[in-house]
């Protein structure tokens, strides 16, 4: 009689893994059965699908646009290990998608783990009623009245940078090359520190900041091949995001550093509030967070949620605005005539004073056009992915032909299907923005009838701030900071590339927390420009 082998731990583990993979396969087949079969590009890799190809491209938006032209406004893209994603490039479908955010379409497991690992379980991480509660509690800090009060903070930070640059230019007025990206990082960090938390990180004064040092380390290191593979496979196995790759170790360090700072600032503010020193405004960001800790059940936030909100604000304040300011200086250095035109508008009204919030918002049309053209061409986040939480029927403004040859004006989306919006593609689409959609041309925003035929919803027909319940809460804050800083820079300095005759170098994508521009051949995410004073 053959002896019976005792079942060991590894047997149980392999059996559980087999069952898990089987359930995933059955679920995937079920989703495919409930989702309209769409056409799409051929697979390039059984292992990575087209994910690695898109991830390594300097312009995935152009790739998505070419696929939309070939396969229609919604198409299927092969992903990791035989999975697929549905990409939508149709204005009506995108409006429907965003309207159902946080309930009908939710963040993918990979996205939620990524957000939790970086900032914690706050507004970015939450869904449904929890998201609605947290957003409602924070909204007063981003009202027009609140941002109007903060405008002077943005100008103060800009002038601190000007003082530092003037010192640099004193030593070499005609040949000063400055890494502008580093300084845009510092102005953004100091602005969010003072505006949000009444705390000066002091990075513009050369003061060491732990959080700035960790952020800078993302800009100076490249992810390892192993880290890239882990990131790609995490779309199917999100638990891989807990592996100690060089990138994930940096993320852990960033979260701890931001958490320590946030904890310290909260504790200081609580003591000020208890002492009734008057230093804490209830409608400031940190004041509202303190208030939310002890609020009634409807708006109450846990301590973990409060810390997560502060982490989000530090991260968003540092990353997004600094990237946009850097792109603005790149585009204006490429086109000195547009730089001069912007300077003329600013100096014709403001030589010894600064614009008010109202003037920044409505009184400087060319500045507004430059800012929105930068945000159109260079959104900090290029694609947005969500997972269907329920079966859905998505309407289309343009009919498409399915894989079976049927013409349809709506598509079925099965529960569990990952759906993506290619933001960069939509912002640069020739169908929506005209034949010169890929060009930096701020004048388009000033033309009569501009945008009348653009069906895309969202701020000024842009998807940069997304739309619906998850539209960027800090949109007004970011726009005002962007305009204030750029107005000071352009009024006081001229910018050009430092090569012979101002030759424009190739601008590459550097993988940081968010993709950043970098000049080809530079170490890390550096953008050196020749800076001269305006005489």
From Swiss-Prot:
Coiled coil: none
Keywords: Heme, Iron, Membrane, Metal-binding, Monooxygenase, Oxidoreductase, Transmembrane, Transmembrane helix
GO molecular function: heme binding; iron ion binding; monooxygenase activity; oxidoreductase activity, acting on paired donors, with incorporation or reduction of molecular oxygen
Keyword 4Fe-4S belongs to the record: no
Assigned GO CC terms: membrane
Cellular compartments annotated: Membrane
Pfam families linked: p450 (PF00067)
Pathway assigned to this chain's UniProt record: Secondary metabolite biosynthesis; terpenoid biosynthesis
Its job: Cytochrome P450 monooxygenase; part of the gene cluster that mediates the biosynthesis of clavilactone A, a meroterpenoid that features a unique benzo-fused ten-membered carbocyclic ring unit with an alpha,beta-epoxy-gamma-lactone moiety, forming an intriguing 10/5/3 tricyclic nested skeleton. Cytochrome P450 monooxygenases claO, claP, claQ, claU, and claW are close orthologs, suggesting that a redundant function or pseudogenes are present in the cla cluster. These monoxygenases are not involved in clavilactone A biosynthesis nor its modification.
Protein name as it appears in the record: Cytochrome P450 monooxygenase claQ
Organism: Ampulloclitocybe clavipes (Club foot)
């Amino acid at each position: 009689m053959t002896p019976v082998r005792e079942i060991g731990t590894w047997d149980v583990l392999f059996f559980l893994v087999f069952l898990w993979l089987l359930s995933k396969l059955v679920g995937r087949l079920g989703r495919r059965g409930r989702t309209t079969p769409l056409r799409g590009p051929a697979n390039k890799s059984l292992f990575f699908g087209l994910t690695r190809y898109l991830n390594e491209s300097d312009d995935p938006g152009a790739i998505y646009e070419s696929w939309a032209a070939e396969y229609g406004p919604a198409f299927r893209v092969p992903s990791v290990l035989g999975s697929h994603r549905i990409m939508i490039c149709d204005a009506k479908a995108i409006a429907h998608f965003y309207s159902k955010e946080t309930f009908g379409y939710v963040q993918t497991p990979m996205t939620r783990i990524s957000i939790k690992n970086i900032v914690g379980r706050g507004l970015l991480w939450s869904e449904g009623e929890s998201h609605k509660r947290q957003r409602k509690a924070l909204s007063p800090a981003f009202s027009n009245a609140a941002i109007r009060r903060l405008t002077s903070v943005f100008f103060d930070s800009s002038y601190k940078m000007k003082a530092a640059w003037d010192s640099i230019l004193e030593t070499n007025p005609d040949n000063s090359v400055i890494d502008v990206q580093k300084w845009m990082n510092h102005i953004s960090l100091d602005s969010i520190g003072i505006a949000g938390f009444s705390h000066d990180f002091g990075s513009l004064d050369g003061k060491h900041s732990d959080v700035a040092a960790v952020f800078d380390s993302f800009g100076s290191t490249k992810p390892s091949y192993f880290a890239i593979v882990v990131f790609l496979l995490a779309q199917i196995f999100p638990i891989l995001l807990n592996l100690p790759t060089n990138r994930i170790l940096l993320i852990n360090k960033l979260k701890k550093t931001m958490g320590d700072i946030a904890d310290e600032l909260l504790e200081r503010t609580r003591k000020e509030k208890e002492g009734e020193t008057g230093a804490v405004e209830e409608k400031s960001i940190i004041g509202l967070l303190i208030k939310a800790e002890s609020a009634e059940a409807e708006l109450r936030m846990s301590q973990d949620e409060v810390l997560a909100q502060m982490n989000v604000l530090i991260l968003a304040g540092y990353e997004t605005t600094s990237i946009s300011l850097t792109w603005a200086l790149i585009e204006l250095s490429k086109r000195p005539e547009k730089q001069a035109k912007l300077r003329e508008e600013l100096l014709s009204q403001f030589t010894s004073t600064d614009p008010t919030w109202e003037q920044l918002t409505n009184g400087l049309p060319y500045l507004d056009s430059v800012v929105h053209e930068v945000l159109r061409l260079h959104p900090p986040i290029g694609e947005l992915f969500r997972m269907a939480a329920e079966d859905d029927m998505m309407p289309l403004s343009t009919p498409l032909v399915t894989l079976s040859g049927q013409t349809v004006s709506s598509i079925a989306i099965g529960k569990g299907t990952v759906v993506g919006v290619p933001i960069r593609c939509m912002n640069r689409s020739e169908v929506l923005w005209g034949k010169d959609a890929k060009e930096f041309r701020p004048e388009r925003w000033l033309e009569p009838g501009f945008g009348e035929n653009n069906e895309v919803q969202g701020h000024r027909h842009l998807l940069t701030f997304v739309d619906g319940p998850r539209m960027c809460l800090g949109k007004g804050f970011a726009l005002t900071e962007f305009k204030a800083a750029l107005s000071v820079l352009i009024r006081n300095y001229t910018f050009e590339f430092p090569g012979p005759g101002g030759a424009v170098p190739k601008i590459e994508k550097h993988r940081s927390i968010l993709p950043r521009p970098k000049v080809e051949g530079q170490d890390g995410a550096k953008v050196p420009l020749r800076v001269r004073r305006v005489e």
